[in-house]
Amino acid sequence: MSKSLHVSYNWNTKKFLQGAKAAYDYELKNSRKRFLGWIFIALTQFGVVLALKQGTIGMLTLSTILVLYWYGFRWKIREYFLIKSFKNSPLKDKSFEVKLNDEGLFFNNSPIDFKDIYEIVSTDEGVLLYFIDNYIFIPSSAFENLEDKSEFVKIIKRKIKGE
């Protein structure tokens, strides 16, 4: 690798929420939980049938509340608690820098072994570097352009595979 990539960004509430949402959406997409919304909708339909046939609205009420939560309030509630925890975080408003060069990958001048990264995910919001028990989010705005972001992801993917 001849080109050195260097990105830096300030870790503020907006970027924190972007990263949390990107990770949440990616992890939900690959989880069985993604089917819960469909189950709640099916329960609502069953509740409508019960309400029309037997006049009972218990199932309809409960399933409607679940659908509203799942599709309307789930992220808002999560966002509230994330913001609350971020306000007390020691990482709030810190500057981070990531360097990728011939010597390796560095986060705030600390080396990251490519063997410790088990997956890299590129989203519109940024790049997620997944480790065993956590992840690092690098917002798209930290990269100079889309080509640098694509190159960063491509190089990391090659290094993870051991090439």
Description of each model-found segment:
Residues 51-67:
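Hydrophobic alpha-helical transmembrane segments
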Residues 103-127:
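Phosphoinositide-dependent membrane-docking surfaces
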Residues 13, 113-119, 140-144:
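A short, sequence-level motif marking secondary-structure junctions
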